[in-house]
């Protein structure tokens, strides 16, 4: 068996085209383009690259993007003040605080300062709670991107045994809620999980988000499974790999996402979808 590749890059481009069409439709109606504000604290090079990529994507679809680079010395009060200012700005539809924040910040508390209807990352407790209650509003971008990717390939997860490896607030936990909503029998594996191999071998749909290169051996993959690899890990030789041992996994799975070019582009595409949605619901 040789797995079919789920090309997140091409699907993300489809979504960008759809969002751009939505923006043009608004402009023809005399309405303004969506506005996204991105807050970046400090000089983290990886975060700077992520922010630049997000702003580029925004410009490609016709959004108005605003970047607020703040020094490493920024206080909690200063960050809260900026978020409150953006909450009240009628031209801003989405507010994104680039993570990770410096260690002295309580990230969860900072994200709670964002108005739920402008929380285009989907991390606010209100939006997570809405997803849990089966009335999703603004959905976390990576899980939303994964669900969109499955849908675009006509892969219906309803009834599948799904395993999410990793229980972060950004991916693992909201991913489990998305899969429950889609009708999966969902298991979440984490650092205390015993007999991980058995769980993986039983999974019809496997989502891995732990940030460890080739953490899941390809030989564990259930024949015919759908494998979604969220990990992005740069090796010492400069090669970028996922959390799943790709080559072996691809001989057993029916479908698999590559790294890079799988989930990553879908996350950015979901951010664009959320921002357009937030704008349309406000104006």
Swiss-Prot record:
GO cellular component terms attached to this protein's record: cytosol
Annotated binding of NADP(+), by residue: 166-168, 232
CDD domains, per database record: NAD_bind_m-THF_DH_Cyclohyd
Gene3D superfamilies: Leucine Dehydrogenase, chain A, domain 1, NAD(P)-binding Rossmann-like Domain
Paired cysteines (S-S): none
Alphabetized UniProt keyword annotations: Amino-acid biosynthesis, Histidine biosynthesis, Hydrolase, Methionine biosynthesis, Multifunctional enzyme, NADP, One-carbon metabolism, Oxidoreductase, Purine biosynthesis
NADP is among the record's keywords: yes
GO biological process, one term: purine nucleotide biosynthetic process
InterPro entries: Aminoacid_DH-like_N_sf, NAD(P)-bd_dom_sf, THF_DH/CycHdrlase, THF_DH/CycHdrlase_cat_dom, THF_DH/CycHdrlase_CS, THF_DH/CycHdrlase_NAD-bd_dom
One Pfam entry name: THF_DHG_CYH
Gene Ontology MF terms in the entry: methenyltetrahydrofolate cyclohydrolase activity; methylenetetrahydrofolate dehydrogenase (NADP+) activity
Listed pathway(s): One-carbon metabolism; tetrahydrofolate interconversion
Catalytic activity line of the entry: (6R)-5,10-methylene-5,6,7,8-tetrahydrofolate + NADP(+) = (6R)-5,10-methenyltetrahydrofolate + NADPH; (6R)-5,10-methenyltetrahydrofolate + H2O = (6R)-10-formyltetrahydrofolate + H(+)
EC number of this enzyme: 1.5.1.5, 3.5.4.9
UniProt xrefs under NCBIfam families: PRK10792.1, PRK14186.1
Subunit structure: Homodimer.
Task of the protein: Catalyzes the oxidation of 5,10-methylenetetrahydrofolate to 5,10-methenyltetrahydrofolate and then the hydrolysis of 5,10-methenyltetrahydrofolate to 10-formyltetrahydrofolate.
Family named by the database record: Belongs to the tetrahydrofolate dehydrogenase/cyclohydrolase family.
Descriptive protein name: Bifunctional protein FolD
UniProt source species: Hamiltonella defensa subsp. Acyrthosiphon pisum (strain 5AT)
